[in-house]
Structure formats: C-alpha cells, structure tokens
Amino acid sequence: NIHGDQVRLVNYRNFTYRSASDFDERYEEREIDVSRMASMDLIISYWKIGPVAHTFVSFNFDDGSPPVCISIEVRPEIGESFDPLSSMFKQFELIYIVGDERDLIGVRTDHRNEDVFLYRINASPEAVRELFRIYLDRINRLADRPEWYHLLTDNCTINVIRYARKVGGPHRRFDVNHLLNGFIDSYLYYRGMLDTQFPFAELRQRSHINEAAQAAAAEAAENFSERIRMNLPGIDQKVAR
C-alpha cells in the first residue's frame, strides 16, 4: 500500500535460521517513510569461486530505521532446483523477496557458506528514492502479471542495471559483466559508482562482510545492519546504516 511517502510493505520476510534447510518462517508488515530514504548498497554473494554471483540491494534510511533489502530471485516449484539452461525456457517464475538483512544476508554468510560483499553506491537520496519506487511498481505489477526468470534477459543483475539506468546510472546497453555478474563491482568501480579512495582490489577486500555478519549473528545483535557496515569504505560511520 502506497500513500505518498508512506508505504506499507506486506510479506516482509524475516526468517530465523538454524541451518540453510531448518528455519522458522515469519512474514511481517512494515511501515516505511520513503522521504527518509538516504542511500543504497549493492550486495554480491558468491556461492563458489568464479565469475557468477547473486546480486541484490538494500535501501537505507537516515532516521535509524532498518534497511529494506530486496532480492530478485527464481521461485522453483517443490522438487525443482535451479538450472541455468532451463531458465531460458520459461521454467522458473521471477520473484522479488523484500525482507530483513538478518535474513537475506545472514542466511548466505552463516548457513550457505557464501562469500558476501557490500558496497555503498554513489547516488543521491533523490535517485535512491526514485529507484525504490521503480522497485515498488515492478513488484506490484508482478503480483498482477507474473513473469519468467531468464538467465540472459531477466535476471537479478540485469534488472538492477535496467532500473538504475532510469535514475541516471550507467547507460551502456550491454556489457559482459551483466551476465558474468561476479565482476559487477569492478564494472561499477571504474564507472565511478563505488567509493574510489582505495584501489579496487583493496576496496573489495575491505567490503567483505562475512566475519562481521557471523559475529553479529552469533551475538544475536539487534544492530546487525550497523555491525556489517562498520568500517566499510564510503559509509559515514556516524550513521553506519
């Protein structure tokens, strides 16, 4: 439900995990004020060493509210597992998961043993808010008219790039990094979309958040989102959220 800057998010995912396959499902409602949205982060998660990863985003607020995390994924049917080739033949429905970072990031760092990196995107608050509204519109349209995930034309990274173009992001229509998305951080770095105070290799090393996420989860820290951003490049540590 959207009323100006006031948005009610339904089916906001906030699972509690004991393992990757053993968890308590919890869907919540959350009220947010889009006018307090101030920045956004790109999260890249690698399930194995290589050029392919999963990318998703978090939208941050300047009033201390927890970030809103959005992940574009496939919705496999019971008994199905993701297959890249099959995804090009209308096999998997596209789904947008909106939820808590302790769920969407924590399950990857703590239970799936994925390597996760978090980068602050160089974007104005106005662009961030506009991008969030594009996501909302897309989510609402999918509820009425489902679409199919497609490895080459409708995947997690291509959609992020497509939406970013609408608010002034890089306009190159196609780049191999859109598919080999494990390199998307390098692609954005050399286009000025990430913090450039460090050489890229050092930025990447500093942006690895597994250790911080695992420590915060082990302590059941309420400030999980703040903890994983501590000392990350490009993020004001007075408001590390």
Model-derived features with residue positions:
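Soluble catalytic domains of enzymes that build or remodel membrane lipids, polysaccharides, and related
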Residues: 83, 91-166, 170-173
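Juxtamembrane extramembrane loops of integral membrane proteins
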Residues: 5-6, 10-12
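Activation targets extended, charge/polar-rich intrinsically disordered C-terminal tails
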Residues: 136-241
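Glycine-rich catalytic cores of cysteine/serine-nucleophile enzymes that process amide/ester linkages
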Residues: 7, 18-116
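Alpha-helical transmembrane signal-anchor/signal-peptide segments
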Residues: 1-3
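Intrinsically disordered, low-complexity regions
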Residues: 12, 20, 185-188
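Generic secondary-structure boundary/loop-capping signal
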Residues: 24, 29, 34, 104, ...
